[in-house]
Amino acid sequence: SKLSGRTPVLKETTHWFLDLARYQDFLKKWVLEEHADDWKNNVLGQCRSWLEAGDGLQARSMTRDLDWGVPVPLPGADGKVLYVWLDAPIGYISATKQWALDNGKDWKDYWCNEERKLVHFIGKDNIVFHAIIFPILLKDHGGFILPDNVPAYEFLNLEGDKFSTSRNWAVWLHEYLERYPDKIDELKYTLTCIAPETKDAEFTWKEYQARVNNELADILGNFINRALVLTQKYYEGKVPACGELTAEDQQVLADMKAIPQRIAELVYQYKLRDAQAEAMLLARIGNKYLADNEPWKLVKTDPKRVETIMNIALQITANLGLVLDPFLPETAAKIRAFVGTEAKPWDEAGSILLQAGDETNAPTILFQKIDDEFVAKEVEYLHASQPAAATNFPPQKEETSFDDFTKMDIRLGTILDAIRVPKADKLLQLTVNTGIDTRTIVSGIAEHYAPEEVIGKTVAVLMNLAPRKIRGVESQGMILMAENEEGKLSFMIPEKGFEAGGEIR
């Protein structure tokens, strides 16, 4: 055991099983046929590996011998608890019932109403529990709706390593918001851009910097600021009238109208990364429209044409305040405040939201550029936070006196020979030159070193440990080893080429 260091003992026990094979035909039809076109490939692939590999589904134990968990309420089940993935999904229903009770709602309207859609947003390591085991429970009980979709995500890594809360290798949201309360949407945007919808992805602060600077600031922020500043400058903040439309104007307005529908389709396909990109496309279109038409130059020669250009730019601005709402709600609210509009139903997105003469307000900067110092600070903070994480190392032992310490005779020794101790997987019998004699030491390092690996190694030896027999071999001392959090052992080898017999003090 990595936790206790003790050797596991094989024992007989009794468990209760869920006979998954009984539901093989139901699941193959429901998952692989009925959802072949609308479920993600990674979900279908995992389900297929369970349903079609070998003899198909096999019975799976639904009980455990543990001292924590939900007790099994059956005769003869003393000491048994429910397998967590039998119990945990049922907790979804219990949580809904409690929420409904607290808020005067009917929980059955969510779990038993065929008009509702049950969607499991999960990580890829929990696909089978939400696409196979939980649906079996719902189906067998009866009266519950089955999941409409299980859009499982792949893994998100962080700065070249896996996220680990135990090692504190994480970006903690509450800490981020304490440091940057005005940068909520910047983090949301970056995370959605790199969402691991189809493959593993990685969050880095350099990526965050690039997304904020190159996309949010240079495209979205630049367009919004330019459209509103020019409106303040030319029309005292009032929306100008729209005149005759060119082919380019008509295409831009057609794109503005089509984008919300595409966003909705992508959202309902659970392609949130593409949906956000589609919303940002409207900002790109607006940015390009102003850059191509250069109203700041054209105003000197054709002010009427500029009125139409600015009207269209403001319509795009107002629509960005609507289509960005699902992704960047803080930013969308600011944009609506700039143009003086309220939050509107989605079916109004893509339409003309502003009338000639409507008042707009002077803008503020939506996104501040992220500099290299910000990135370096966050990476340093991430690394610096690791020592504060919980470790598996034991606490410091009680203090001992210097006199007691000096009683230990610790010296360098060289391993001359090594063989495995019969019928002992962990033990090596070592022949060690200690500088003053050659002695036999039995050491529990066989799971970490092969006999041929240790010959010639200079190691630390506790010399005056009382001899004792281990598996019939008298051991005359102890090899001192270093151990890491994972329980792996390593020799403590001197930095310089010291000879056997040198004292360690």
Predicted regions and their residues:
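Structured secondary-structure scaffolds
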Residues: 2-233, 277-279
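Short amphipathic alpha-helical face segments that pack within enzyme cores
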Residues: 132-137, 315, 319, 458
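Short clusters of hydrophobic/aromatic residues that line enzyme substrate/ligand-binding pockets
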Residues: 1, 70-74, 111, 163, ...
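Phosphate-backbone binding interfaces of nucleic-acid-interacting proteins
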Residues: 387-505
